[in-house]
Amino acid sequence: MAAARRARAGDPRAGFRRAAEEQSPAVPQGLIRAARKSGQLNLAGRGLGEVPQHVWRINLDTPEEAHQNLSFGAADRWWEQTDLTKLILASNQLRCLSEDVRLLPALTVLDVHDNQLTSLPSALGQLENLQKLDVSHNKLKSIPEELLQLSHLKGLLLQHNELSHLPDGFGQLVSLEELDLSNNHLTDIPKSFALLINLVRLNLACNQLKDLPADISAMKSLRQLDCTKNYLESVPSELASMASLEQLYLRKNKLRSLPELPSCKLLKELHAGENQIEILNAENLKHLNSLSVLELRDNKIKSVPDEITLLQKLERLDLANNDISRLPYTLGNLSQLKFLALEGNPLRTIRRDLLQKGTQELLKYLRSRIQDDKASPNEEPPVTAMTLPSESRINMHAITTLKLLDYSEKQVAVIPDDVFSAVRSNPVTSVNFSKNQLTAIPPRIVELKDSVCDVNFGFNKISSVSLELCTLHKLTHLDIRNNVLTSLPEEMEALTRLQVINLSFNRFKVFPSVLYRMLALETILLSNNQVGSIDPLQLKKMEQLGTLDLQNNDLLQVPPELGNCETLRTLLLEGNPFRTPRAAILAKGTAAVLEYLRSRIPT
């Protein structure tokens, strides 16, 4: 209040300003009164072409109601007003900000994103208490030097502007913790960036950078660095010393090799897809003990080293669209791996139908091949019992050796009784009835309830889940993709051990409510349905949920509270009709999407 009181004085031009303001959308006096009490004013999305003068002078002019109300009630003590500390002017039609912004010296947050600003007032430099400035999604071509005087600024959001250069003294903003410069026209970064030692998140995505300054390694607090979609051919070797780095995004550049990061012991996510990387070697991997996400899709990688098994915390590995012809069978020993993408590779030792069975089936197969690989490393792997020879009716070898009952790709409408009879004295743990013409789940599946833990009914014509299936109390994996399901029975709640369920390519219009109560679920695949909404509060209760695939549904909005589901490591939302988060945010990966959603939660 002190700063505002010192500036409080009569305004001889008030009459002229008031007349001009009558031509602009009015700001309700109720909002102004509330802002004087709370210190916060939200004018987002009001169609403002300019900021009314009485907003800038909110703490200077005597409120009009003070002349009309002489009761001096406790609720009307206008002289006890609070200095404005938070001003939101987002999503209007502002072309400029007045220099009168200096009349709000107590501001800690100023949000002017999504306007049409082409410049910023030099008076911003006088807001010495400012901690967060959001001027993203405007048309800014430069930043005033005075902005560098904001020594307490912690968050500066400049994404989606037209900046081609930054002031050399940018490093003066020593308190910065978050800096977003994505989607501009930057060709270089000032060397003074090295002084930003408190920076935690730096986003340089979608610019025109050809290299990064070696001095960037001085940012010892940096946890997230996003250089997606630039022209980088390499990264400085000094990057390897950034010990705090947790997320590194290098997608859509011109890299020919992965950087070696021996000191990045905390790195959890490395995204380097859509580059020109040809070699993945042990040196790239051996120090990354904390890595949970490795994304290398759309490169030219020819082989995967056995050292991939050093990444024991890896949960997501994306190697799609490379030149890989053979996988090391030891890949099956990555016990935490929940998602493995291999499509678009010329794999000779893995059949396509096996790839379609999902990550867990593939890992299981790779583990089963480890001993054979040691015994005859130069031989092509023989046909295994994972698929049955077409002339074989029931594969007893698969039943007795692999505990697998496989009657897939027979195009039958009913599973013959002798198939179930074959396993009476040989309990199986896996059942594969996929790619048939089944319209219902076989009732005799209940006979397997004491042993089976993995069931595949994918690619049939099943319209409902039977109660018999709900008795399989040991079930951990259930695949019912590509059927005609519209709902799930509440009795499925009894499947208390179920970890993975695949419901993709069905006809669900609502998210099956029973899934919210199946708290052991780690993976829900529900892509290519017609789901219109989700309940983030219920999802947050699912503390084991790590993967949620809702691609190609009918979601009109993504609830911001979904960002609080911090156990999610893979969240796929592409192909829905919602407008936010935008595609550029989705492309950054799950962590960025969740962070964006959290930032949208009303406070």
UniProtKB/Swiss-Prot annotation:
Residues 1-27 are annotated as: Disordered. InterPro entries: Leu-rich_rpt, Leu-rich_rpt_typical-subtyp, LRR_dom_sf, LRR_domain-containing, LRR_R13L4/SHOC2-like. Keywords: Leucine-rich repeat, Repeat. The keyword Magnesium does not apply. The keyword NADP does not apply. LRR repeats lie at residues 83-104, 106-127, 129-150, 152-173, 175-196, 198-219, 221-242, 244-265, 266-286, 290-311, 313-335, 336-357, 401-422, 427-449, 451-473, 474-495, 497-518, 520-541, 544-565, 567-588. Pfam families: LRR_1, LRR_14, LRR_8. This is Leucine-rich repeat-containing protein 40. It comes from Gallus gallus (Chicken). The gene is LRRC40.
